[in-house]
Each structure stands twice: as C-alpha cells, then as structure tokens.
Regions:
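Helix-breaking motifs and short loop linkers at transmembrane-helix boundaries and internal kinks
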Residues: 89, 110-116, 144, 296, ...
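Extracellular/periplasmic helix-loop-helix junction of adjacent transmembrane segments
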Residues: 44-76
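Extracytoplasmic gate region of multi-pass secondary transporters
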Residues: 43-44, 229-282
Length: 429
C-alpha cells in the first residue's frame, strides 16, 4: 500500500487535521469544478457573439446551451462516469477524461461553423460530467471526518474561481469580440492539459480499493433505489435539481439576457456575473469552509439563512422591472445565499449519504438529472425571457422555495461523522 493510500485510510481517525497531501489532492480534484463552471460561463459570455457570427436563431442558442456542460451533455457524462467510477475506480476515469475535455474545448475555440460549435460543446459537457462525480467522490473518501465539509467546500471555491477567471478574461478581451471569446476557450484548453498532467501522480482512493474487494449485495445498483439509499437519492435530487435551474440560469444566461433585453452592454453583463462569483468565493471561504463541519445545528442555520436570501434574490424579478440595479440586487443576494445553501452542501451530502461503491453512481445520477432538466429549461428560456424576465423570475423563485424547504426540513445529521459511522447509522435507521 502506498503512503497516499494509507493516508486516505487513516483520514477517519485524523479528526479535523488536513495534511498537505490532502490539500494537494483537493486542488487537483477541485479543478474538475473549475473547468466545469469555467466552460459553462465561457459559453455564456460568448453566446451572443457566436449567435451573431453564425447567424443562430433563439432556438439554436437554446439548443446549444441545452447540449453542453450546463445541461444534457454533462448529464450523459455524469450518468456514465459516476457509474464507471464505482465499477472501475476513481483513477481510471479522471486519468483520461480531461483529454477528451481539452479536445472539445479546442473544437469550440476554433469553430468556424455551427457543427463545430455544437460538437465541441457536447463533447465538453460529456467529459466534465464524467469527471465531477468521480473527483468529488475521491475528495469525500480521503477527507478527515471533521474536515470533509471544508475540503469539499474548497471544490466549490474552485467552481467559483473558474468563472471569475473566465469572466475577467472576457471583460479584458471584449474589444476583440469573437476573437476574445476564442482566447478564453484556449485558456481552458491549457488548464485542462496542465491539470491532466499533474493528476497522473494521484493514488487510487483507499476506501474504493477496500470496498471493491467485496461483493456485498448492498453495493449492487438496485440497492440505490430502495430503503435509506432511495430516501437519500430523493433528498439530494430535489435539493439540487431545483437549485441548479436557478444557478444555471444565472451562470450561462445573465450576460446574454442583459444584452438581449437592452438592460446593459455585453461588458456590463460579464462584469455583473463576475461579481456574483467573487462573492461566492468570499462567502464559501470565510463562512462555509469554516463552519460546515462544526455541528448539525450550525448547518441548519447556514442553510436556512442562505435559502431565504436566494428566494428573495429571484423574487425581486417578480415585483421590480428588469434593470441593472435589480440585477445587482439579485447577484449579491444569490451570491451570498447559494454559498450557504447550494451546491456545496449538495456535494457534501452526496459523499456522506451513500456507501463507497454507490457514491459516484448516486451523485452521477442526481447530477445528471439536474443537468438534463436544466437543459430542457435552457432550451425554452431565450424564448421565455424574450419579452421580459417576470415569468422566468417567478418560476425560479418557486424552484428555490422547494429546494430550500427540502434541505432545511429533511437535512441529515452527518456533520463530523466518519463515512463508516454514517453508513452504519443509516443501515439501522
């Protein structure tokens, strides 16, 4: 057994102490989130430019958003990658998928016609979809019991950092129009190749290595759809599916909608989106990573406050006209709220509530369902928002109420417990 594998095994006993090696692994695994969100926002920032260059209709724009990293392409990758990560190991998936991602990104960057743009977008979606559940399972499995929220939360910092870098580049390169968008995609191409090279030295998950040696019936796929596992699957799915529609709308469509509805320029849309992700980095780092492992009671407070802020964030679109001041209010409120009651907790619960041999499958399933439904939503949103954002804002507010209420009232008591302890408690519940 290598030192890395031994470290992964001992993490249960280490309490809240995080080693330098664990931080390094978290950074490399977290780059999946960086590349995921970065590709989503790069596509969003360049959407109007590609539409003008290629003469795309509103329907084509919706279809492009629907098949890519924000939606259906990612969903297909998550369904396949999550399951294969459980069957074949985490390392076999993250060892190759970033090469596929890089190929897709390069296709987008060099796109001179509609087929190139659509093929590249779909390939990127599939590749990043396969990487995310596998990488997150790896982080959850090597994290100390009392620092799991901190390390998984760090991947959310990476998820916010990707868009910030992408949006700042987009803002700086705005005078170059479409050439600037191409350069942004080339940046993601380089980051993917560097991350792939650095990941080659990562060890396999010690927990997966141990669990894969058994043939226990409780690890079979059908076990995921019964008993405690089914309850956990429904819980994480409801929380994430409804939240993700709102988050995905802001991530990919904010610059597009601002420009299309003449609420501001392309540069203004990019800058406002960037501000939201900067807020996310700050709140996740200073609040989520600090308090997520403290206690179940603390998690409830964090979630409750965050959920309310997010509902208000999209509720303003229902009662106020779509304008720059209203957009700023939405971005600030949602930026704070989603850092406390959003994807970070979904990621943590997805590691805590499922056994090792079903962990990637479960997260791939819920991640995939969420991205599929976001794809359906994305297809109709340009048409839905063409005459204003009131109806879309009302629906998004409703979705956030459902997600927030589910997370608050059905939140599991898992803070600070080892994965083995949680599994044992759920088996006897």
């Amino acid at each position: 057994m290598t030192s890395g594998e031994a470290l992964g095994t001992r993490s249960v006993e280490d309490g809240g102490t995080i080693s330098r090696q664990q931080w390094r692994w978290s950074v490399l695994a977290g780059m999946a989130s960086y590349l995921d969100a970065g590709s989503i926002v790069a596509l969003g920032a360049g959407l109007a430019l590609f539409q003008s260059y290629l003469g795309l209709s509103d329907g084509a724009v919706g279809a492009l958003a629907a098949i890519g990293p924000n939606a259906i392409g990612c969903a297909i990758g998550a369904f396949i990658g999550g399951r294969l990560g459980d069957k074949l190991g985490r390392k076999r998936i993250y060892k190759y998928d970033l090469l596929v991602y890089a190929l897709g990104i390069l296709c987008i960057a060099l796109a001179v016609n509609t087929p190139m743009l659509f093929i590249g977008t779909f390939v990127v979606g599939v590749a990043v979809g396969a990487d995310v559940p596998t990488s997150l399972a790896l982080v959850g499995e090597f994290s100390p019991a009392k620092a799991r929220g901190k390390l998984v939360g760090f991947t959310q910092v990476a998820w916010n950092l990707g868009p910030v870098i992408v949006l700042l580049l987009s803002l700086a390169l705005t005078p170059l129009d479409l050439l600037g968008a191409r350069i942004v995609f080339l940046h993601l191409f380089v980051v993917a190749l560097v991350t792939w090279a650095m990941r080659r030295g990562l060890s396999e998950s010690a927990r997966w290595t141990s669990a894969s040696a058994t043939k226990d019936v409780k690890y079979q796929l059908k076990a995921l759809f019964s008993g405690a596992h089914l309850k956990a699957l429904l819980f994480t799915a409801i929380v994430y599916v409804f939240w993700n529609i709102a988050a995905g709308t802001g991530g990919i469509f904010t610059p597009y909608v601002i420009k299309t509805l003449n609420a501001g320029s392309q540069a203004a849309g990019v800058a406002l989106s960037c501000a939201g992700f900067v807020i996310g980095i700050g709140v996740t780092t200073l609040v989520f990573m600090k308090f997520a492992d403290r206690s179940h009671h603390t998690r409830k407070w964090m979630w409750g406050i965050g959920a309310v802020l997010q509902v208000v964030a999209y509720g303003v679109y229902v009662v106020l006209p779509f304008s720059i001041p209203v957009i700023i209010a939405n971005i600030v409120l949602f930026g704070v709220g989603c850092s406390l009651a959003g994807e970070a907790f979904y990621k943590v619960w997805s590691q805590e509530l499922f056994p090792t041999m079903l962990r990637g499958t479960a997260q791939g399933f819920t991640f995939g369902v969420a991205r599929t439904l976001l794809g359906v939503w994305s297809f109709f949103l340009p048409t839905l928002a063409a005459g204003g954002f009131t109806l879309a804002g009302g629906l998004l507010t409703l979705f956030l109420v459902i997600s927030g209420a589910t997370g608050f009232f059905f939140m599991p008591d898992t803070s600070g417990k080892s994965l083995e302890q949680i599994e044992a408690e759920r088996a006897t519940a």
